[in-house]
UniProtKB/Swiss-Prot annotation:
Belongs to the carbohydrate kinase PfkB family. Pfam families: Khk (PF25270). It catalyses: beta-D-fructose + ATP = beta-D-fructose 1-phosphate + ADP + H(+). Activated in the presence of 0.5 M KCl. 85% activity at 3.5 M KCl. 60% activity without KCl. It comes from Haloferax volcanii (strain ATCC 29605 / DSM 3757 / JCM 8879 / NBRC 14742 / NCIMB 2012 / VKM B-1768 / DS2) (Halobacterium volcanii). This is Ketohexokinase.
């Protein structure tokens, strides 16, 4: 049984009092990726055509790989497709905000023409495509996931590409008056420095009612060289002069950013502070399976995360934390309360496999402390 610490108790109590009974909605915009996710399982042992046992954990998968390496033998896995869904930053956050009663728009790599999974799910929303989507095979385990990704048009997307496909006037129409803009993933977008520059220099000056917040998901920057990341840091920090930039990263993404800042630590809070200092943005959120941190110039908030031993879905739990964090910024909640909302959206998602309605979010946040007892 987990026991929430006093800081988490205070944060949950304050969040329960701070969340409004209902939201008025409003426009939000998400760019610039776009994925079609094929959810899969590895087969451990097959009893019949219809019956099999899956490889239960990443540890079990790693053990098989290591055994094969030690034996100097090749290795074969059978895998089962357990569904197809739209994925990536734009899909997960647009889906979550749509379900909570907002009006999301999507500017992303959705296909030429827009591919059917995106049309089927998001055809009622404003959609602008930037080219071919990426494809991800997401292999689910009880303790995590293995994601095999083909990136698509995002790999070469730059500011000129966005301008030529969407047009500055149309992009301004979608952004002006929006409550928030979300952007992801930096790691899949080598030209992000140029896109951040274009947003700051060419788009934001044209807006009469710009969003107050831009949420940036860096993704796994370990796949990008330090020089590439450094160029992005410079432009992301400069973008913060035009709009409040909130960067949100998981534990291992945060650790990489901290190491780029010269900080080696096993303390998640210290790593989050180092990432914040390195990026030069308004806020940095580090989210993990045990705790989450939100850092800004005024200080740091830390909140415990209620875990579940029986998750329905873990792939994209971080995106759903980001959806809650984004909502909290739209609602202008405090640091600790924002973390509770992020954890509540993610917590509902991993337990049910779908994002919450706003009422379901409020119910989870209201019972936040009870979920520690249920772990």
């Amino acid at each position: 049984m987990e026991t929430p610490d006093e800081t988490t108790v205070r944060a949950a109590d304050s969040c329960r009092e701070s969340l409004p009974e209902r939201v008025d909605g409003g426009r939000v915009l998400f760019g610039f990726d776009g994925y079609i996710d094929r959810v899969r399982e590895f087969v451990s042992e097959r009893q019949s055509a219809d019956t099999y046992e899956r490889v239960p954990t990443l540890d079990a998968f790693a053990e098989r790989v290591n055994d094969s390496v030690e034996a100097e033998s090749s290795l074969t896995f059978e895998w089962i497709q357990d569904g197809v869904r739209t994925g990536g930053h734009v899909s997960h956050l647009a889906r979550a905000f749509d379900r909570m009663g907002f009006e999301p728009g999507v500017v992303g790599c959705l296909g030429d023409p827009v591919e059917e999974p995106f049309v089927e799910e998001f055809g009622h929303l404003p959609l602008e495509t930037l080219g071919s989507p990426g494809y991800t095979d997401a292999v689910e385990f009880g303790d995590g996931k293995l994601m095999l990704t083909e990136i698509g048009a995002l790999m070469t997307l730059d500011w000129a590409g966005i301008e030529s496909r969407v047009g500055l006037d149309r992009l301004a129409e979608l952004v002006d008056g929006a409550e928030l803009v979300g952007m992801g993933y930096w790691s899949e977008m080598p030209e992000l420095p140029d896109v951040a520059r274009g947003l700051r220099e060419e788009l934001w000056p044209t807006l009469s009612d710009p969003p107050e917040t831009l949420l940036l998901d860096p993704g796994d920057l370990r796949k990008r060289g330090p020089d590439v990341v450094a160029a992005g840091v410079e432009q992301v920090s400069a973008l913060d002069d035009a709009v409040r930039v909130v960067v949100s990263a998981n534990r291992y993404e945060t650790r990489y950013l901290a190491r780029l800042a010269g900080v080696e630590s096993d303390d998640f809070g210290r790593e989050s502070q180092a990432a914040f200092d390195h990026l030069g943005v308004s806020r940095f959120a580090g989210h993990g399976i045990e705790e989450a941190h939100l850092v800004d110039e005024a200080g740091t908030a830390t909140v415990g995360v209620p875990r579940t031993d029986d998750p329905v879905l873990t792939t994209s739990s971080g995106d759903h934390f980001n959806a809650g964090l984004a909502l909290a910024h739209v609602l202008d909640l405090g640091r600790a309360e924002s973390l509770v909302v992020g954890n509540a959206v993610a917590g509902h998602f991993v337990r049910t496999g779908s994002p919450p309605t706003y009422d379901e979010l409020r119910a989870f946040a209201s019972g936040y402390l009870d979920y520690f007892d249920a772990a």
